[in-house]
Amino acid sequence: MKRAVVVFSGGQDSTTCLAQARHQYDEVHCVTFDYGQRHRAEIDVARALALKLGARAHKVLDVTLLNELAVSSLTRDSIPVPDYEPNADGIPNTFVPGRNILFLTLAAIYAYQVKAEAVITGVCETDFSGYPDCRDEFVKALNHAVNLGMAKDIRFETPLMWIDKAETWALADYWGQLELVREETLTCYNGIKGDGCGHCAACNLRANGLNHYLSNKAAVMAAMKQKTGLR
């Protein structure tokens, strides 16, 4: 039996990954992390979506220690989430240091226990927003280290790594989940479901991607299929 574990936040990217995994694996588990995040409403959204999309199990893990160590606008109410700035340089204050290091490592430990062959994460280098832990180089390096440390061959899969946000919408549509992703996921840094606050960087990427996809469906779908190998 083919099993996979999805690092699942209930946002656009991880929900699209879950929708695809349900078609590609016999059994899919979801792992969601409570780190005291500002947008903590995502945990309840993730619970509902994991159930709706047929995950075999859904674990919510308490990693609030990360909140104590990592200072970010997503872990401190005293630090405002900035509005989207198209020409911003450097790492944004929404970056949570160590988050994906911790999430992927814990998901791999869970995968070890349930005998899953893959850990799936929705990180993306095309629209990575300046986060160093969303890069392909990082994911591959951590995958190698985790496998060495557990003497196990668990594969870190990144289905969205080389597609942009419009193509991510196309992928959700390909699996018949466009409206669910649009209406029921939570991507917004301010914790607003669906189309979100409309001001933060996450909402801007999501909205621009959707608008581009809806305006150029055939071309974007074709590009997505070419990049992912789907037919």
UniProtKB/Swiss-Prot annotation:
Keyword set includes Secreted: no
Pathway: Purine metabolism; 7-cyano-7-deazaguanine biosynthesis
Single Gene Ontology BP annotation: queuosine biosynthetic process
GO MF, any single term: ATP binding
Signal peptide limits: none
Coiled coil start-end: none
UniProt remark on cofactor binding: Binds 1 zinc ion per subunit.
Protein's name in the database: 7-cyano-7-deazaguanine synthase
Species annotation: Salmonella schwarzengrund (strain CVM19633)
Origin organism lineage: Bacteria, Pseudomonadati, Pseudomonadota, Gammaproteobacteria, Enterobacterales
